[in-house]
Amino acid sequence: RECQSQSHRYKGACVHDTNCASVCQTEGFSGGKCVGFRGRCFCTKAC
């Protein structure tokens, strides 16, 4: 199962999944992706 949590450190609109994922990795997650119309960065990890 994969859990998602909105990034606390990511600033601005999320356009590229790779940028979001690298910020999420500094927060202790395995990756991340942009979600939704407004482009929020959500971090993912196995749970």
Curated annotation (Swiss-Prot):
Question: SMART domains in the record, alphabetically?
Answer: Knot1
The GO annotation for biological process reads: defense response to fungus; killing of cells of another organism
The record's section on Pfam families has: Gamma-thionin
**Source superkingdom:** Eukaryota
Q: Which organism is this protein's natural source?
A: Echinochloa crus-galli (Barnyard grass)
The transmembrane segments are none
Instruction: Please report the name of this protein according to its UniProt entry.
Output: Defensin Ec-AMP-D1
Q: Which keywords does this chain's UniProt record carry?
A: Antimicrobial, Defensin, Disulfide bond, Fungicide, Plant defense
Q: What does the UniProt record say this protein does?
A: Has antifungal activity. Inhibits spore germination in F.graminearum (IC(50)=15 ug/ml), F.oxysporum (IC(50)=102 ug/ml), F.verticillioides (IC(50)=8.5 ug/ml) and D.maydis (IC(50)=12.5 ug/ml), but not in C.graminicola, B.cinerea and H.sativum at concentrations below 30 ug/ml. Inhibits hyphal development in P.infestans (IC(50)=25.5 ug/ml), but not release of zoospores. At concentrations above 100 ug/ml, induces morphological changes such as lysis of hyphae and sporangia in P.infestans.
InterPro entries associated with the record: Defensin_plant, Scorpion_toxin-like, Scorpion_toxin-like_sf
Lineage, opening ranks: Eukaryota, Viridiplantae, Streptophyta, Embryophyta, Tracheophyta
| Keyword Disulfide bond among UniProt keywords | yes
| Cysteine-cysteine disulfides | 3-47, 14-34, 20-41, 24-43
Q: Which family does it belong to?
A: Belongs to the DEFL family.
